[in-house]
Amino acid sequence: LGDVYKRQDQYLLILGARLQGPKTRQTGRTVKFTSKDLKNWKFEGDFWAPDLYTMHEMPDLFKIGDWWYHIVTEYSDRSKMVYRMSKSLEGPWIAPKDDAFDGRAYYAGRTFELNGQRILFGWVATKDQDDDDNNFIWAGTFMAHEVYQREDGTLGVRIPETVWNAFDKEEKTEDFVIDTPTKSTEKVVAKDTGDIFKFEADVEFTEGTRTFGVRFYEDEDKAESYQFIFNVTEDRYVFEKKPNWPWPANQNIGLERPLELVPGKKYNIKMIVDDTIATIYVDGVALNARAYKRPGESLSLFASEGSLKVTNCKVTTGLKK
C-alpha cells in the first residue's frame, strides 16, 4: 500500500517495495512515481532505501511546519512503526534517537489530519489463542495515538483528547512518597478498577533508585499482576508479568521503550486499560501491550532501592454514557 500527494503541478505516489532476490536479503525500500493526471505514472526510483528491513509496509508521508515525516512499518522480528524526518522530499532522511511510535504490539498504522491534529491509527495485535505465553499474530484492535511535534522537530505521541475525556468516575489519591532504600515496596491506589479504566500520576524518583512502575490487574494476596517497570540504570521501561513464573509467564519480546530517566525530574504517566489492552504514555513515549489472564483488579505503584514521590494520582473507571 502507498500514498499519493499533490506537489505543485504533479502528483507523488510512494509505495513499499523490495529488490528482487532472496527473501533473506534486507532490501526493503520506499519507491516513488510521479504523474500529472493520476492516469499515467512515471517510475522515479528510490524515495528512501536504507537496506534495514526485508520490506517496507504501509508507507506514509506528511508535513508539520518545516519538517517532512516518512513513516513505515518495518517488516522484521520487531515489527515496529518507525519514521525518518527531512526538510526536503529529496532527503536526506534523518533518524531521530527514538525513531518509533510504540513497541512490538503496535503495527501497520496510517495517519490522517483531523481538526488540526495528526492521528495515527494502528493495530494492537492479538496473541495466538489469546494466551500471554504465545506470540503476537496479525491484526487485532485499532487504536489511535495523537502525533505531535516536539521543539527539536522529533515526534511524540499522546492520548487523543476525546479518548481521555470519555471516562466517568474519577477518584483522586492523596500525594505520597514510597521510601524504600533497601527493598521493593508498593502502594495500592485502587482496589476495584474493573476492566476499563484510566490512570494518571506525576512521579519523581531520587538518585540511586533502581526501578519504579505501575502494576494493574493485581491480586494482592498472590502478589500477581502485570506491570510497566521503569529500569532507571537502563533508561527504558518494559511491560511484563509479575512474577515472571513459571518461566516465561508472558512473551514480552519487543514490549519496551527507551526513555531517559533522570533523578529529580517530574514524569507524567497516563495509562488506559481496556479489557486485554494496556496503553501507557510517559512524556510522549507510548507502549501498547496485551494482558489476558487478569489475576485481580487492584492498581498500585512501586519502587525499589530508592524513593518515589507521587502527585496528581487519579484513577477513573467506566465510560460516560
Regions found by a protein language model. Give the residues of each.
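Short, small-residue-biased leader/transition segments that mark boundaries at the very start
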Residues: L1-Y5
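Structural motif
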Residues: P22-V31, R78-R84, D130-N134, M143
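Short, aromatic/His-centered strand-loop micro-motif at the edge of beta-sheets
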Residues: W245-N268
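Ligand-recognition surfaces built from glycine- and aromatic
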Residues: P295-K321
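Secretory/extracellular carbohydrate-interaction modules
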Residues: D179-N244
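Blade-edge beta-strand/turn elements of extracellular beta-propeller
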Residues: V31-L52, Y83-D102, G153, V157-P160
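Short, solvent-exposed beta-strand-to-loop segments that form ligand-recognition rims
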Residues: G284-S300
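Short tryptophan-centered beta-strand motifs in secreted/extracellular beta-sheet-rich domains
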Residues: L61, F199-A201, K265-I280
